Amino acid sequence: MKKFNEKVSGMSASPIDVQESELRLFPGLDDEVAATLRALKASAAGERPRLVDTTMLFAPRSGGVKRYLLSKKAWLADHRPDVAHSLVVPGAGYKASLDGIVRLQAAKLPFGDGYRWPSSVRRWGAWVSSLNPTLIEAGDPYTPGQGALEAGQRVGCPVVGFCHSDPAALAALHFGEWAKKPVEKRWAKLFSQFDRVVSPSRFIAQRLEEAGVGGILIRPLGVEVDTFHPDRRDRDWLLKKLGLGADARLLCFAGRPAKEKNVGVLIDAVQRLGAPYHLVLVGAGAGMPPEDRVISLPYEKDPRAVARIIASCDAFVHANDKEPFGLIVLEAMACGRAVVGVNAGGVAETVDESVGQLAASADPIDYAEAIEALFARDVEALGQAARVKAVEQFAWSRVFEDLTMLYGELTGKAEFVTPQEVLPIN
């Protein structure tokens, strides 16, 4: 870990002068680049301390990381107005929006469900530097994460690495066990360079420690408890939409159609159980052939629409046994739904018998048994307990208060920390 106190003391007092020649091979030939750089330099001239979040895990259909970042942006605007916040992510072109989201052109990943891969660490770091950040948070170990480290060195500001995924496990899943160790080595090398490493779960913290990264701070993610609310429940509406009778038991999963989500386990388990169970897939069934007892609904961009579907089902199901955290599980709990998970990964740290049921493994037989065990209990009472737990332990306000304390510690800037209440003198 770097000595961030030394970096803070050496932070630049004036904006870093990033030239267009650092961003394009032939400067002056791209109006989008020039306009975006001017906009970033103008915003960097302000006096407020600036937090810059950057990641490639931000796509039109991406899930937890994107919702975390957008929720943080909204919370900072409401509760830390003296802090400027920019979000630097890949896009189809170059654009700096008034809401503080900066999109930098990057190529789409083949079969990547809309994700884009920036090609140049040096250029990404230059773009982030142009914002003159007080603090940078990197949300991945890829080009943006590496660029964040370069920008931190150039500007002289601390850089936080928030570990939202386990790329070594993903490499093993998609390419075989041979790919795990090389990726793990690069992952550990990068995260060892951050001034502070944050993990959303003990599961990911342990994986980082196994890879050789130390000094990890565990900070769970949160949930928008007003958006994801039991009041959105309308079971009759959903049954009519699905063409099912009142005796149906609706199990919901919402997420990307990614291999690690183990959607096949959910399908096999429901088909083993048979009537009256039905699996409702929101977004996760894209591209799949029709399956008995499985209903695929399209991806929903509006969180309120997702909340309405989840709240209107009877239980939420999640079979990823290597999930780093599982933000969608919290959202289901906030909707007042009991959850069936797997006794492994980050989900097992959120779900217990007080709010749902854990399968012994991500095996269809074990998972089917867990579903049956859940419905042998008082599912509605479990859902009410899930709502209470989500509100009391995982509301975004609590999560971001903790994070901004860390930001204040790293930067020495009081604007990140809640000001003390001034009491009137009688």
Which ranges hold each PLM region?
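Short alpha-helical donor nucleotide-sugar binding micro-motif in glycosyltransferases
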Residues: 308-313
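Nucleotide-sugar donor phosphate/pyrophosphate-binding loop at the beta->alpha transition
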Residues: 158-160, 168-189
